[in-house]
Amino acid sequence: MRILVTGGAGYIGSHTCVELLNAGYDVVVVDNLYNASEKALERVEEITGKKVVFYNADIRDKEAMNDIFDKEKVDAVIHFAGLKAVGESVVKPIEYYENNIAGTLNLCDAMRNHGVKNIIFSSSATVYGDPAFIPITEECPKGTCTNPYGWTKWMLEQILTDLHTSDPEWNVILLRYFNPIGAHKSGMIGEDPKGIPNNLLPYVAQVAIGKLECLGVFGDDYDTPDGTGVRYYIHVVDLAVGHVKALKKLEEKPEVRVYNLGTGHGYSVLDVVHAFEKACGHEVKYQIKPRRAGDIAMCYCDPTKAKEELGWEAQYGIEEMCQDSWRWQSQNPDGYATEK
């Protein structure tokens, strides 16, 4: 099978390309490199010993997308491309709706024009908003999103569901998850955020390597074991494998399927800090700060459905997530700008 991966040069996309190539799939990547590096794909090829077909293109470019589908006879699409920073989405809602919604509509139009009706969508557990219950199952009410990023994911899930309703040949899988962390065991590919990291682990890693001075921990008075917020994290390689497992599910009768991908339990902010200290061998400085508005005490998912229907289960715990992140960060202190 030939798989088109949008956003395939990004953090999750590049790791998914490795797993796809290792599983014997042919891979075509479309990425505008806004928050990614072509070097990631060069390293994907080095890791796997296989070639990736790469197009530096924006999914919002209708002509470019139709040209790519003309040239590459793909069987399915794994869709990662889009803006993804929660905080930035609050400041730049128009950019997020235009990029994520319009871009995906354009992608789906090109797919329809070329008879490609298999899509795995990289959604997010942000669609659950402040969850009605924990652990979160796929039946947890959604649509109470707290930021424009979450709303784009919610809207795109609805759009893809409507596509299947209008044409039952559309085969759609929606994968929901939070907080991918870690890196490939080789240390050759990993998360390379531009500027100050938005997410916890890249920030911790940059404090550990000395690029940033101190981690701010927002709140230590939550109703959790150590008072800091509890979230669920997933190793990016586990997440990539989940997307490959989902491809096999697309071979069954077309419908809309939804799966949570996670470890099934959460880790507090200080759990992550202490695990990273163990991985890097020295202290990670942090400072307790006031709670942030909108933050919730605890959030993690129940991945039972993915285990039962996809045969997928997370293999890595927080220790390995931190070890692999540290290997990537220490070998590549400036990300893909680091000369190898």
What function would you assign to each model-found segment?
Residues 97, 146-154, 190-198, 202, ...:
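Short-chain dehydrogenase/reductase
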Residues 182-184, 221-222:
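Short, basic/glycine-rich phosphate-binding loops at helix/coil junctions
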Residues 1-183:
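N-terminal Rossmann-like NAD(P)+-binding domain of SDR-like oxidoreductases, especially those catalyzing
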Residues 24, 150-151, 195, 263, ...:
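Residue-level detector of secondary-structure boundary/capping sites
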Residues 200-340:
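C-terminal substrate-binding subdomain of Rossmann-fold SDR/epimerase-dehydratase oxidoreductases
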